[in-house]
Amino acid sequence: MALNILNPGLSTSIQDLGRPGYFHLGIPIGGAMDRFAMRVANMLVGNAEEAAGLEAVFMGPEITFTEDALIAITGAELPVMLDGVEQNTWTALTVTKGQTLSFGFLQSGARIYIAVSGGIDTPVALGSRSTYPIGALGGVDGRNVAAGDMLPVGKAGKAMAGASIAPAHRRMPSNPAILRMVKGLYWHRLTEASGQQFLNDEWKVAPEADRMGYRFRGGKPLEFVDREQPFGAGSDPSNIVDGCYSYGSIQVPGGTEPIVLHRDAVSGGGYFTLGAIISADMDYIGQLQPHTPVKFEAVSMDEALAARKERHNLLDQIRASLA
């Protein structure tokens, strides 16, 4: 069986849960920007949660199916159609051979996830099928999908059409979106007033936000404590001697526009990081559209761990409901 890509939409790529273990070599973890949505889509069609599916940004692709299949659409909300007939999202849908899957205009969120029973079965690169175009890894010969591609699908597992996920289990962006963060090693570089101003300000997602990082604009420039820059750090107070970046780190080049480093981000560099977004909110960031208002909220490590546990418990509930 294969998926025939008639129209790839704006930007559609093959993604799974990523390729951890190579960050020390400068290869990003990659994978779905909204891992929760990717996991749930796979659960609905009977796949392993790490199976590969499609991630579409802002606009869905147009696809025909060479055989009968079970599919699920999760993530952003938008009209989903099979041969022009609207279907439910977050639901296991039966597709018959020759039918065409298409999408309407985005209503909320930013990224759409498409899982098919059996999972997309393209070659594995460093333990993952996830597309990383800069490194030409995964995907279709290292690139996003294009019109005319025939994406192979693996052997289908067991699942029932009609299974669905309740709206209460779906987290969509609020206004403003609240991004919880833990202050980092370089927070002390800010003046006390500037650190508080950063948290008080309302920022907006910049149009440049992508898989490498989400940039934000609109807040006041940061002010730094006067100090002598260490040798090799450069003259700008936002510079450091090169250090490692964790997933979710918040760097602020020049002290003006925060960037949250996401799935395809670099593993290190010479900008200070004032903290990191908690893991429970990283999927949420992947669903923020440009110009969405955002506020950063500082939380403790215990609060961050509690939020992560809450997300894990939610996934356990969904697994149990679909078992």
Annotate each predicted stretch with a short phrase.
Residues 1-323:
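Conserved "landmark" site that anchors the functional core of diverse proteins
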